[in-house]
């Protein structure tokens, strides 16, 4: 039974914040896999996201399979394209890149994914995906050939997020990008959170417990940590 989205909404209603660890299959150190698993198990993470911008479907499937065997947390696909699917995952963030105007990432990749998704028992969670300027060009920007929303364009971020909600997005994701120089601005998180009714995800450029807490305090319901954990698997050790 598909229950993840219902749980996310219930947590939002009850003010329960959630932390997700994003794992990129291309960047996993398999020689240190056991220690990575232990680090995740001892972290405050509630979710595992699997994805990135450029890797193969086989790498995604391999990582999801290993995670499901080792860790008792929901594993959610965060696909960079229509081929990055894995039957063993619990759910998929069905992303539409609303901040850009490239039709391939607004709708074409989604259409291409449908035949495979119809054969899988995945919980499909429509997600309005907004790329926010982070101080340098990110892989998402390069691959999607789109420009991010500027850091001072708070109204544009708010209106884009709300448009996504009106169109049916069940989640809104504000993304600074992998290895971002700067995280999503606090005033932007706050403004978007105050405008939408669906759960808000914030990720990219968050490298300390203080920054994570600031994002939560500004209204993020789910915060995603990727590069910080990737570079230091003991990132959560002092929490």
Please give the residue ranges for each predicted region.
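Active-site mouth loops of central-metabolism enzymes
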Residues: 17-33, 79-81, 131-157, 202, ...
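Glycine-rich phosphate-binding active-site loops on the catalytic face of alpha/beta enzymes
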Residues: 50-55, 91, 95-106, 174-179, ...
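Conserved anion-binding
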Residues: 84-165
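Catalytic cores of alpha/beta
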Residues: 35, 77, 81-95, 194-225
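Hydrophobic faces of well-ordered beta-strands that scaffold small-molecule active sites
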Residues: 19-23, 48-50, 75-77, 92-94, ...
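N-terminal amphipathic alpha-helix/helix-capping segment at the start of soluble metabolic enzymes
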Residues: 1-23, 27, 113-127, 133-134
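Alpha-helix-loop-beta-strand connector modules within alpha/beta enzyme cores
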Residues: 60-83, 113-125, 182-208, 238-239
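Glycine/Thr-rich beta-alpha phosphate-binding loop at enzyme active sites
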Residues: 143-188, 230-236
